[in-house]
């Protein structure tokens, strides 16, 4: 029973080598970086499991004996957005390594804005020595949108750093020591308290374009940072790039950090590139590590074949 690594834009080699280390008895197949399988088409009949990142729909259609589709990304919209889905379970990979990487990114960006990173970079360029007032972490409220595994862990990390953390999610969630809000009724209350808004939302019909001019205008305006800050490490489709660019340019947002965008790679002509109060990273907040995640997948496959239930199954209707 073969495993196929079907990825577009990534080199499959590191995944293949790690899977072969962990499961030498299994046949491991791979696509090219273009997502196309160039091997013997007859070999696809052996494929029972696919590890996917932006898989080609025509390739999935050729897998007559597929049993499980594993997403190699933190999100699953790259699969759920396909015009036709195979009628098999889709599983997300939830792993401590991936979770830790996301929390590191969130903490890095929160601290950059909290400790006035842009101002210090400017002062250094000007060769000017000036002590800036530094608010305590406890004076700053971090609002986290999306309270799944990644959001919960990021919230706990920020609490340990001393920040006041609140959360918002589609449905009601309870997290010890963190005030949470949910649904449309809770959104405005949540936004009105947030000095730094961190989005770790999945991309669903309900979240598409949610971070727009209207939402940004409802963020807290009189906080210790001089205005609100936006951090998005969730999905690019949840934001309106043009609205964020305009808000950064006119001061509605005093700063932002974006790891995701509506169009990726971010086009050279995007106005976001020229903004000096924006940190841009190329969708690397939580890059999947073959060494860590392949073990998780092999363990899941082994358990599944022994009759156990798969973990972290995706509900296509909900989008995550």
Predicted ranges, named:
Residues 1-49:
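N-terminal glycine-/charge-rich "phosphate-binding" loop or analogous flexible N-terminal tail
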Residues 40-43, 59-62, 189-193, 271-272:
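Structural alpha-helical scaffold elements that stabilize or flank donor/cofactor-binding regions
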Residues 46-121, 135:
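Phosphate/diphosphate ligand-binding glycine-rich loop within oxidoreductases
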Residues 54, 73, 199-201, 234, ...:
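Glycine-rich, N-terminal phosphate-binding loop of Rossmann-like dinucleotide-binding domains
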Residues 92-105, 119, 264-320:
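C-terminal helix-to-coil terminal segments
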Residues 120-153:
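Glycine-rich NAD(P)-binding loop of Rossmann-like domains
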Residues 160-177:
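NAD(P)-binding Rossmann-fold cofactor-contacting core
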Residues 172-271:
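Rossmann-like adenosine-cofactor binding region
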């Amino acid at each position: 029973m073969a495993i196929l690594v079907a990825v577009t834009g990534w080199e499959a080699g590191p995944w293949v080598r790690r899977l072969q280390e962990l499961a030498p008895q299994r046949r491991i197949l791979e696509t090219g970086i273009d997502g196309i399988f160039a091997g013997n088409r007859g070999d696809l009949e052996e494929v029972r499991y696919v590890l996917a990142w932006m898989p080609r729909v025509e390739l999935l259609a050729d897998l007559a004996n597929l049993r499980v589709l594993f997403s190699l990304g933190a999100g699953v919209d790259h699969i759920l957005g396909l015009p036709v889905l195979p009628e098999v379970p889709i599983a997300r990979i939830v792993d401590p390594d991936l979770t830790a990487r996301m929390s590191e990114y969130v903490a890095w960006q929160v601290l950059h804005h909290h400790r006035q990173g842009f101002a210090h970079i400017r002062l250094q360029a000007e060769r000017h020595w000036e002590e800036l007032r530094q608010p305590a972490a406890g004076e700053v409220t971090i609002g986290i949108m999306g309270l799944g595994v990644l959001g919960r862990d990021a919230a706990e990390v920020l609490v340990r750093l001393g920040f006041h953390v609140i959360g918002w999610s589609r449905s009601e969630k309870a997290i010890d020591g963190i005030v949470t809000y949910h649904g449309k009724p809770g959104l405005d209350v949540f936004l009105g308290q947030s000095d730094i808004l961190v989005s770790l939302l999945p991309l669903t019909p309900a979240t598409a374009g949610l971070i727009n001019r209207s939402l940004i205008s409802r963020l807290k305006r009189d906080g210790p940072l001089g205005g609100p800050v936006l951090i998005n490490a969730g999905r690019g489709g949840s934001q309106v790039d043009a609205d964020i660019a305009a808000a950064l340019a006119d001061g509605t947002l005093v700063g932002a950090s974006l790891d995701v965008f509506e169009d990726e790679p971010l086009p050279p002509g995007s106005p976001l590139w020229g903004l000096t109060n924006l940190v841009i990273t190329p969708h690397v907040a939580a890059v999947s590590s073959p060494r860590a995640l392949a073990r998780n997948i092999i363990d899941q496959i082994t358990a599944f074949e022994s009759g156990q239930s798969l973990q972290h199954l995706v509900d296509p209707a909900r989008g995550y």
